[in-house]
Every structure is written in C-alpha cells, then in structure tokens.
C-alpha cells in the first residue's frame, strides 16, 4: 500500500497543511516530554528547505469539543520555535478554521511556520464533519499527514481534509508504515511477536492476525493468566477474564494447527496483595495458592523468552510482561527490553509501557523502530486499514 510522500511534491511557493501529533504531556503549562514535537522536525525542515510555508495542526488532550484554556497549543508553539531556529518565523493562531485562520495562512511566507489551535476544540473534528474538512483545506495547497499516532482515527484533520487536497505522507508516517507493514508483509525470519498487557479481550484481533504470520508468539502480562486458566491452571486471585477463556483456548488450538509456537509463562512472580510492599515469591504456573496473584513473569520464563527473542530476525513487542508500574514486578518487562536491545534483527516496539521500559533503561538507541502510535500500531497489527493512511494519494 505505497503512498505518495512529501518527496513527490514541488514545494516551491506552496502552503503545506500538515497534520502532526503534538499531543504532548503538560504540567502547569510546561511540556514534560517533547518527543512527539521532535519526531515531526524532519518533515517540517524538509518542507521549509524546499520553499514551502508550513501550516501545522494537531490535537492536544481530550477537551471534549470545547475550548479548554489549559489545552491550548501555545506551549507547543514556544517549544517548536526553540527547536526550529532555521524557520523565519514560528507563529501561533488561536483559530483552527474560519476567517482568522485563513488570513494567517494567506499571510504566511515561504520559510515560515504557523501552528493552528487545538483541532479538538471544534466539535466537528472528531465527527469528521465535511464542513470543517473543507475549511481546513482552504488553508493549504497540499495536505501532509505526519501524525501516525492519530492515523487510526477518521477525523476532519486526519481523513476528511485529504478528500479536498492532494494528500501525501510525511517522513514519520512513511517510517512507521515501512517498519510495521514491512515486518507484517515481508519479515526476515524467524519472526517473533511479544504481546503483553492486562486483558486478552483488547488484543484478540491482534493475536488472530499474527498467528497467520509469525513463527513464535510470546504472551505475558495479565492476559497470560487467561490463557493459563484456559489450560486448566488454578490462578488464585490473579486478574483473569473467564469469559475470554474459550477464546484463549481457541487461539491455543489455532497456533498448534498452524505450527506456531505460542509460548506462555512457565513460572510467575506472585504476591499476596496488589502493592509494591506485598509478600512475593516465584512459583511454577500450576502452583498459585488461593489469595495470591501473578504479577510478573518468572526467571525461567524470562530465560526462555530471551532465547527466542535474541535468535529472531524480526521482533515486534507490544505491552508489558507484568505490573510494570510497581518496581518489584517490573523485572519481566525490563528483561524483555534488554533482550530486544540484544537482538541483532529488525526490532520494533509499539506504544505505551514497552516504550517507557526501553527509555527508562536507556536502550532506545538499540531498537530499530519505536512506534509513536500505540493505538494505530495495534490496529495495523490487527490487519486493519488506517483511515488516515487510506486517505493519502497512492504512489
């Protein structure tokens, strides 16, 4: 599904209308992590260097279709100006569409950057309202989507606007699609995926899709408990989803039929309460006493999973192996992060706690691709078409 990119456009004198993902964490009006802003810089710089005026749009937080003062993009504008000294100007607008936004866009000169106000202040954004899409399209000559993290949303700024302008991918979008789709469509083998997180119900579609593609699937986190329950193990007070046990059993059967190694924990770290100072011990999966709960994978499981990961040529990891936010139960997740860093093949991490683990351990530079979109990468792994990608012009 090759898409046109910003390299396919002659930008001289054109206005680039770029959807970016500037949904950064703020505390008291200060940005606490500017990773997402930095991720958009290669695209913005390319456009500026090639003679474009650049108009940026993004959402921030969940303002619920109204103006929320603490969710304005002013702090983002200030940070972007610091990161882009080469821009002739970095301006902010308090409008997203309408006469004020149109005037600001019209006055923008090549080499200058304009950041529109939070797209989600407008109730039409999340409704993918055609009137908003048309108003946004008035602001630019060519639409660029570089917001992979929002590509699974069909909103006015991610999907609707692409119907009314030539529409191409930015560098971040291109890199995300190349890594994730490349791994799914033509992986170097052995191809291994590691799926963690609390609930199997959130990831059934992902596991079903991957069973047709991978050589091995490693399961951890709370979702492993439901698989173990389906195998007949007593799980004590562990988080389980009894309603999903038949699905877990079916997935185990499908894996066996397809010759896929679906690996589950063989030992677990258990605790007598859900807290960092609970009593804890390591037991085989069949020996969890009543009143105790599994909160992490055990050392034997870590060894087995590490061996499979380090021997792989393509690995995708999504979701923690245990209750990563409690230090005594973070070891499994940290060990998988280390195994990923030691793997010589194509390593991809998709979203959330897995990324946090890699960054906390200072291993980010050892991973080939760290996805900026948790929800979007999950939907790609599930085999879904992302609306924000489908809307772009085919190459």
Swiss-Prot record:
Entry GO CC: cytosol
Name this polypeptide is given: Phosphoglycerate kinase
Gene designation per UniProt: pgk
Membership in a protein family: Belongs to the phosphoglycerate kinase family.
Coiled coil: none
Domain of life per record: Bacteria
Binding sites annotated in the UniProt record for substrate: 21-23, 36, 59-62, 120, 153
Root EC class: transferase
Swiss-Prot/TrEMBL catalytic activity: (2R)-3-phosphoglycerate + ATP = (2R)-3-phospho-glyceroyl phosphate + ADP
GO terms under biological process: gluconeogenesis; glycolytic process
